[in-house]
C-alpha cells in the first residue's frame, strides 16, 4: 500500500509521520486522523490513532479511543500488526535482566546496612531519607520516561537511565556526609525508575503478545530475587567489608549490562520529532503537575509515618497540595490539546481500570509484607539481619518461582484472566493465614504462611502487566506501561507508610498505661526481668505487626472482586520482521 498512489487524497505533511504495517509491507505516510482510519484493516475498529499517536503514543487533539469504545463490540488490539526487530534474545534478555536486578536490588540492599552508614556519616534522624530518596525519585520519574521514550527513542532514554544509575552509585559510594548520600541516592532513583520503565517498554517492542509472558516472567523472577536478596547482600557486605561496596558493586555489573544492550539490542526505527514540534505539543503542565503531586504526596507520607504527627501543619500541607496537584493533572489530561502523559481514555474501560487499581493494591500488600516481616523476625524473634533474610527466603523463592510459572502458563494457555483471579484468591487466603502469626508462633509455621501468601503475590506479577499490554494497541503501550508502573509504585509507597502508621498507633495503644514505649529493640525487651511483663511487651509488638496483616485482608478482598471485571483479550498478534532494506526508515533512536 502506498498512500501516494491515491490521486484524490491530499496529505498534510505538517500532521506528522505514521508507521503503519500491512502484511509484509511497512510504509511511512503523512496523515490526518481520518486518513489513518481509512487505511487501517477492517477488523481494527476499536482505536483511532493519529499520526502523533505513533510518535508520542498519545493524541493531542482527539481521544485515543474512538466512539466505538462506548459500544458493545469487542476491542481487539491484537489486530494491529507488530513489526519486530531481529535480536539475539539469549544476549539481550540477560542484559535487560541485569539492569532490572540492579534497579530492584538498590531498593532494599541498604536496609540492613543503614545503622552502619548512619554511624559512619553521623546521619542522626535523617537516616530514613537514604531509602526514601531512591523510591521517591524512582516513582516521580516514571510518567516522564514513557513519553520521552516516544519522543527521543527508547535507546536514548534506556542508556541515559543506566548511566545515571551508575553515576549515582559511584557518588553514593564516595559520599562523605548524609546530604551527599541522600542527593546521590535520588540520582540513583532517577536512573532506576528509567530502567524499570524502559525495560518493560522494550520487552513489549521486541516480543509479540503470544511469547511476551515468558520474558516478562524472567523479569519478574529477577525483580523478586533482587528485592529479597538485597538485605542479605547489604548485611553481608557491611559486616565483611565496607558499606561503600554496596554501591561500588553496581559499577561492573551495570557496565556489563550497558555494553550488552549497546552492542546487541536492536529496535525498529521510530519517527523523530523536531525540537520545535516537541515544544509545541508536549504536555509540560501535565508532567509538572503529576511529578510535583507525586513528590509532595510521598514526602508527606514519609514525614507523617516517621514522626507520627499526621495532624501537623507541614504534613497536612504536603498531603493536601500533593493531592491537589494530582487532581489538577487529571483535569489537565481530560482537557489539554497537547500530547497527554496518561490518556484518560484508557480508564474508560472497566477492564483496564480494574487492572490498574488491582496493581496498586497488589503492590500495597507486597510492600507491607516485604518491609514488616523482617521487623517481626528481628524485634520479636531476635534474628540478626542475615538470619532475618534467611527466614524470608520462603517468601522470595516461592514468589519468584510463581512469577516465572505464571508467565509461562499465560504464554502456554494464552489466558491471563484466570491466573489473575486465582492469584487474588490465594493471596486472600495467605493474608488471612498471616493473622495467625503471634509472638510464640513457630518459625516453620510462619514460613509456611509466608509461602502461601507468596503463591498469591508471585502469581499476580505477570497477569497484570500482560493485561495492560494486551488491552491497548502497540502505539499506546509506552504510556500505558508508565501509568501502570506509576500506580504500582504508588501502591508500594502507600503500603510502606500505612504499615508504619498502623504499627506505631497500634503499639502506642497497646503499651498505653505501662512504663514501656515503642522503639524498643529485641535485646531491650528480652532484658526485662519480670517474665509476665516481658511476654506482655513481646505480645504487644507482635499484635501491632499482626494488625498490618488484618488490614491487608480487606485490601486483598477488594483486589479479588475487581479481578473478576478484567476482560480477557486475545493473546495473539500479527507479526512481521523488520529488515534493514525496508525503505523509508531512519536509524533507530
From Swiss-Prot:
GO biological process terms, alphabetically, are: basic amino acid transmembrane transport; transmembrane transport
Q: What is its subcellular localisation? A: Membrane
Q: Which GO terms describe its molecular function?
A: transmembrane transporter activity
- InterPro entries reported in the protein's UniProt record: MFS, MFS_dom, MFS_trans_sf
Q: How does it sit in the membrane?
A: Multi-pass membrane protein
Look up keyword Zinc-finger and say if it applies. no
Answer yes or no on keyword Transmembrane helix: yes
GO cellular-component terms in the record?
endoplasmic reticulum; plasma membrane
Q: What superkingdom heads the lineage? A: Eukaryota
Transmembrane stretches, start-end:
90-110, 128-148, 162-182, 189-209, 217-237, 245-265, 284-304, 311-331, 355-375, 390-410, 419-439, 448-468, 483-503, 545-565
Main site of residence? membrane
Its keywords, alphabetically, are: Membrane, Transmembrane, Transmembrane helix
Q: Which CDD domains match?
A: MFS_Azr1_MDR_like
Q: Which Pfam families match?
A: MFS_1
The family note in this entry says:
Belongs to the major facilitator superfamily. TCR/Tet family.
- Name the record gives this protein: Uncharacterized transporter C3H1.06c
Q: Which organism is it from?
A: Schizosaccharomyces pombe (strain 972 / ATCC 24843) (Fission yeast)
Taxonomic lineage of this organism?
Eukaryota, Fungi, Dikarya, Ascomycota, Taphrinomycotina
Amino acid at each position: 500500500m502506498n498512500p501516494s498512489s491515491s490521486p484524490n487524497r491530499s496529505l498534510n505533511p505538517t500532521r506528522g509521520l505514521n508507521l503503519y504495517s500491512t502484511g509484509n509491507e511497512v510504509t511511512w505516510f503523512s496523515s490526518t486522523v481520518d486518513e489513518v482510519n481509512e487505511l487501517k484493516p477492517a477488523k481494527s475498529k476499536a482505536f483511532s490513532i493519529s499520526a502523533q499517536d505513533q510518535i508520542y503514543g498519545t493524541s493531542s487533539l482527539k481521544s485515543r479511543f474512538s466512539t466505538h469504545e462506548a459500544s458493545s463490540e469487542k476491542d481487539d488490539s491484537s489486530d494491529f500488526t507488530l513489526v519486530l526487530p531481529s535480536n539475539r534474545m539469549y544476549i539481550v534478555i540477560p542484559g535487560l535482566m541485569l539492569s532490572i536486578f540492579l534497579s530492584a536490588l538498590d531498593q532494599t540492599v541498604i536496609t540492613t546496612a543503614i545503622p552502619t552508614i548512619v554511624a559512619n556519616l553521623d546521619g542522626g534522624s535523617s537516616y530514613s531519607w537514604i531509602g526514601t530518596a531512591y523510591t521517591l525519585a524512582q516513582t516521580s520519574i516514571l510518567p516522564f520516561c514513557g513519553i520521552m521514550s516516544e519522543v527521543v527513542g527508547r535507546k536514548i532514554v534506556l542508556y541515559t537511565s543506566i548511566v545515571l544509575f551508575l553515576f549515582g552509585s559511584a557518588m553514593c559510594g564516595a559520599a562523605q556526609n548524609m546530604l551527599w548520600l541522600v542527593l546521590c541516592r535520588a540520582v540513583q532513583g532517577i536512573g532506576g525508575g528509567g530502567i524499570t520503565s524502559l525495560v518493560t517498554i522494550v520487552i513489549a517492542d521486541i516480543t509479540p503478545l503470544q511469547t511476551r509472558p515468558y520474558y516478562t516472567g524472567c523479569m519478574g523472577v529477577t525483580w523478586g530475587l533482587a528485592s529479597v536478596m538485597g538485605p542479605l547482600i547489604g548485611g553481608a557486605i557491611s559486616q565483611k567489608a565496607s558499606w561503600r561496596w554496596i554501591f561500588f558493586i553496581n559499577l561492573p555489573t551495570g557496565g556489563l549490562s550497558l555494553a550488552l544492550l549497546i552492542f546487541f539490542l536492536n529496535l525498529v526505527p521510530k519517527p523523530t520529532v523536531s525540537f520545535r514540534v516537541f515544544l509545541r505539543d508536549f504536555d509540560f503542565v501535565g508532567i509538572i503537575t503529576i511529578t510535583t503531586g507525586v513528590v509532595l504526596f510521598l514526602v508527606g507520607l514519609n514525614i507523617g509515618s516517621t514522626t507520627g504527627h499526621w495532624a501537623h501543619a507541614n504534613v497536612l500541607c504536603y498531603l493536601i497540595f500533593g493531592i491537589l496537584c494530582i487532581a489538577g493533572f487529571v483535569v489537565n489530561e481530560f482537557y489539554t490539546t497537547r500530547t497527554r502523559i496518561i490518556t484518560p481514555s484508557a480508564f474508560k474501560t472497566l477492564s483496564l481500570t480494574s487492572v490498574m487499581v488491582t496493581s496498586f493494591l497488589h503492590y500495597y500488600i507486597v510492600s507491607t509484607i516485604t518491609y514488616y516481616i523482617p521487623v517481626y523476625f528481628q524485634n520479636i524473634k531476635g534474628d540478626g539481619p542475615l538470619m532475618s533474610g534467611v527466614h524470608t527466603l520462603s517468601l522470595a523463592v516461592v514468589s519468584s518461582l510463581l512469577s516465572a510459572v505464571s508467565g509461562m502458563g499465560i504464554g502456554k494457555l494464552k489466558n491471563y484472566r484466570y491466573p489473575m483471579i486465582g492469584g487474588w484468591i490465594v493471596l486472600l487466603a495467605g493474608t488471612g493465614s498471616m493473622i495467625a502469626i503471634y509472638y510464640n508462633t513457630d518459625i516453620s509455621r510462619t514460613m509456611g504462611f509466608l509461602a502461601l501468601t507468596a503463591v498469591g503475590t508471585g502469581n499476580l506479577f505477570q497477569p497484570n502487566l500482560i493485561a495492560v499490554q494486551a488491552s491497548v494497541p502497540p502505539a499506546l503501550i509506552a504510556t500505558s506501561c508508565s501509568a501502570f508502573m506509576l500506580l504500582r509504585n504508588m501502591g508500594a509507597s502507600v503500603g510502606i507508610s500505612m504499615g508504619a502508621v498502623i504499627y506505631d498507633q497500634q503499639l502506642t495503644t497497646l503499651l498505653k498505661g505501662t512504663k514501656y514505649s515503642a522503639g524498643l529493640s529485641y535485646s531491650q525487651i528480652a532484658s526485662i526481668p519480670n517474665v509476665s511483663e516481658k511476654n506482655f511487651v513481646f505480645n504487644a509488638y507482635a499484635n501491632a505487626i499482626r494488625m498490618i496483616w488484618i488490614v491487608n485482608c480487606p485490601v486483598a478482598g477488594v483486589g479479588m472482586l475487581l479481578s473478576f471485571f478484567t476482560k480477557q483479550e486475545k493473546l495473539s498478534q500479527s507479526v512481521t520482521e523488520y529488515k534493514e532494506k525496508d525503505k523509508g526508515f531512519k536509524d533507530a533512536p
